[in-house]
């Protein structure tokens, strides 16, 4: 079997998710080829293989015990700690503002529809890729503002995460930030430019914002203490997609389906709640991620409702209102 046929064969097996732990060396070689991996030495390659093998065993175990499916993907030669350190970015700033009002949602949830999704109303912008920059906080907050703009003006726009990275002096750019502090920083800055005017660079740079080009301005921001998780069903249609904090460790190798087991060992990633529904009698939440469309369900993922999946209720949800 020549090399091309070999890779096609292994790729077909990988896509089927019917993994055999004894074939880990074959899967690893296909992974290296598919994702153009280059290691500094054979010692480093061996180290990466051992991490890959550990991740493969976890994927196999999850595929046997969860309703979701998991796969070898672009993160599979990284340890969980490495992935969290490089591709998330939720962290506590050294200082905070106090602009956002805190609202206690302790009323029982209403009886809304069984499913709702802002994507079906064309109010969610395309999935982005933060790359190796810990700016998930900027993507999640601006994703919510993009949706609010679409709800208000019936137009999809892309706002500048790079402006947030460079010009939000409360949060720490690619070194991390929080959701409500990002909204507070936008209020202080006066607005946000389009991505086309201030393109993404995935790195910390000097602030170059131009207030004459601000397209979206934030009027108020809110933080919600959610006593009943189902209360999000009432909130989501009212305020638009909601930025939320999670522990991303258990979703790294996610492919598709509803995640039933996602534990919380500490919040580290910001994502955007865009919808909810029911599949095979399992109620779920749908989140937009920032790891590109080649991850998960075209960049989105689903978790089971009412289990505090990935610690989604452990931090206050944040929203803002635009002018």
UniProtKB/Swiss-Prot annotation:
PANTHER family associated with the record: CYSTEINE PROTEASE FAMILY C1-RELATED
Further details from the record: Optimal pH is 4.0, also active at neutral pHs.
Proregion span(s): 17-112
CDD domains recorded: Peptidase_C1A
PROSITE patterns recorded: THIOL_PROTEASE_ASN, THIOL_PROTEASE_CYS, THIOL_PROTEASE_HIS
Lineage per the UniProt record: Viruses, Viruses incertae sedis, Naldaviricetes, Lefavirales, Baculoviridae
Catalytic machinery residues: 136, 269, 289
Short name of any one Pfam family annotated for the protein: Inhibitor_I29
UniProt keyword terms in alphabetical order: Disulfide bond, Glycoprotein, Hydrolase, Protease, Signal, Thiol protease, Zymogen
Reactions catalysed: Endopeptidase of broad specificity, hydrolyzing substrates of both cathepsin L and cathepsin B
Molecular function terms from GO: cysteine-type peptidase activity
Glycosylation, residue list: 158
Enzyme class: hydrolase
Post-translational modification: Synthesized as an inactive proenzyme and activated by proteolytic removal of the inhibitory propeptide.
InterPro entries, alphabetized: Papain-like_cys_pep_sf, Pept_asp_AS, Pept_cys_AS, Pept_his_AS, Peptidase_C1A, Peptidase_C1A_C, Peptidase_C1A_papain-like, Prot_inhib_I29
Cystines in this chain: 133-174, 167-207, 262-310
Biological process annotations from GO: proteolysis
E.C. designation(s): 3.4.22.50
Region forming the signal peptide: 1-16
Functional summary from the UniProt entry: Cysteine protease that plays an essential role in host liquefaction to facilitate horizontal transmission of the virus. May participate in the degradation of foreign protein expressed by the baculovirus system.
Family the UniProt entry places it in: Belongs to the peptidase C1 family.
Species for this entry: Bombyx mori nuclear polyhedrosis virus (BmNPV)
Protein name: Viral cathepsin
């Amino acid at each position: 079997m020549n090399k091309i046929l070999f890779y096609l064969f292994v790729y077909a097996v990988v896509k089927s998710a019917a993994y055999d732990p004894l074939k880990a060396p074959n899967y690893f070689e296909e992974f290296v080829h598919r994702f153009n991996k280059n290691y500094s030495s054979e010692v480093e390659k061996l180290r990466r293989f051992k991490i890959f093998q550990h991740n493969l065993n976890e994927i196999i175990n999850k595929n046997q015990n969860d309703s979701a499916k998991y796969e070898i993907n672009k993160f599979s030669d990284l340890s969980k700690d490495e992935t969290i350190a490089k591709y998330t970015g939720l962290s506590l700033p050294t200082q905070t503002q106090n602009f956002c009002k805190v609202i206690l949602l302790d009323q029982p949830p209403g009886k809304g529809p069984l499913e709702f999704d802002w994507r079906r109303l064309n109010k969610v912008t395309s999935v982005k890729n933060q790359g190796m920059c810990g700016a998930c906080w900027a993507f999640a907050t601006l994703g919510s503002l993009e949706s609010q703009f679409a709800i208000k003006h019936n137009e999809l726009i892309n706002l500048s995460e790079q402006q947030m990275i460079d010009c939000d002096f409360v949060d720490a750019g690619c070194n991390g930030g929080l959701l409500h502090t990002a909204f507070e920083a936008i209020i202080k800055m006066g607005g946000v430019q389009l991505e086309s005017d201030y393109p993404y660079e995935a790195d910390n740079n000097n602030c170059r914002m131009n207030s004459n080009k601000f397209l979206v301005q934030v009027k108020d921001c809110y933080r919600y203490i959610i006593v009943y998780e189902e209360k999000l069903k009432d909130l989501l249609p009212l305020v638009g997609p909601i930025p939320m904090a999670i522990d991303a460790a258990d979703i790294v190798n996610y492919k598709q389906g509803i995640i039933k087991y996602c534990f919380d060992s500490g919040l580290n990633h910001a994502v955007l709640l865009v919808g909810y529904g029911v599949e095979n009698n399992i109620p779920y939440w749908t989140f937009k991620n920032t790891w590109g469309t080649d991850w998960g369900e075209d960049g989105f993922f689903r978790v089971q409702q009412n289990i505090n999946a990935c610690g989604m209720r452990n931090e206050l949800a944040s929203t803002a209102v635009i002018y």
